[in-house]
């Protein structure tokens, strides 16, 4: 909680960002979200921010005037916040971004906070709920008592792309299986096309996850089925040149053997291009690429019976998305696997270097699972955190984190685009994928709903932001998926929670600059009226503008943390496979130094995949699980 004086200050900040919203409701919702995440430091940081902006002496140093924020008029408050946004001090920039993102997301995502009034201005209308599938998902969570010990042959930690496949392979081979999933269970009737509920229910840290400095927003699923429940269904195989790289790093079987696993996975999750229809945003990307003579291809997706509602990022109410929950996990349960949701694996237990099981917390109940084998599939953030809490994985555990940083580029078009409508991703271009050997970026588009848009769009003043939001239905975003080579790291805090450290630097920073410039050119070629970057002071180019000057301006401004919007939906590495001692796991995905411990998620990647990783996670999980079961 925060005290009354701090709440009053927070209300004034929220009212500055969005005067048309209900500032009191927004302020209380911010506190509620941070409390729900359950990390006391987040609230402590908020209190510090609120105290600083009310301290006259501090503000002499920070903004050059002995003022209290709450004493300023609206224009003075806006100028104050811009000083924080534009500051050379990283902590001030991150403080601004934290409160700005929360305030604006809540204002546009919650009816009582302002969305009832603000959403109609954007041109957004919530779609009618799609018809439920004939057979909704029906995976019941195992009932457990405090202090209970369960037993199985194989304990799988995580139920996403890798965990579900590993659970099925083990159960199909006749092993007894228990799956521990930190997120909640769900069924299609629980899924509604509302951002606030979907983010809180289905995403890590309620959709608010980020690197420790807030420089990169992290989107990661945390629910039964993991990221496959909330992703955009893009199903791409690992390119041949990157497979060769991985082979050189010791991850064997990347050729014909992996193709067999890809084919099996594609068949089970029904990957196809039959229903990959272009919406206006994907059509704009294709049109711009065509105009520039650049290649593009149709994206295969794991969907059947898609209703084109565009709200795939918050789960598929129609059951058309062939997530791991509806496919492999359902198959595993049919073969006897047991599932426990809302259950966090805390430590891996061992005796003399051999796995004996897992300790876990399910609400207020502490349980133990005895198992001959443990499969780690909690993702590239959750898996290393579990290894680090357990003192396993060696010095490389948590290192070599890759994020595919995305510096999105925004443009206004003369015709309606409605980024939230239709198939989210249907076009991908690898025209820029090999600008520096195997490094570059692939161009795609994201589905963007008003809450996420409001949080990400540049804020220079309340009026400026509202003006952009009022034209939201005519904006399109292109997202360059940058294959990064400079890794980050996952650590844990004193409570064992994951901390993600990552900086876009060196060659990756240069590639992000190039990605912004090339994305802008594609927008212009597609007929955009104006293109703007996501810098806190946006750089704008219009048709006929000087692209050389634009590129120079982007290069000069750079991509330092919290000076430009950056997000990641692909977290990889941190328990990478390889033949050398620098790898956490061997070429079979077995963790070095601990018998019976295996990796089956994106943390096993030796480096960045360069393409959306879901299909590769599933294929590798199938391969690694089968190798494990042969031992």
Task: Name what the model sees in each region.
Residues 169-178, 183-195, 223, 334, ...:
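Glycine-rich loop(s) and the adjacent beta-strand/alpha-helix scaffold that form part
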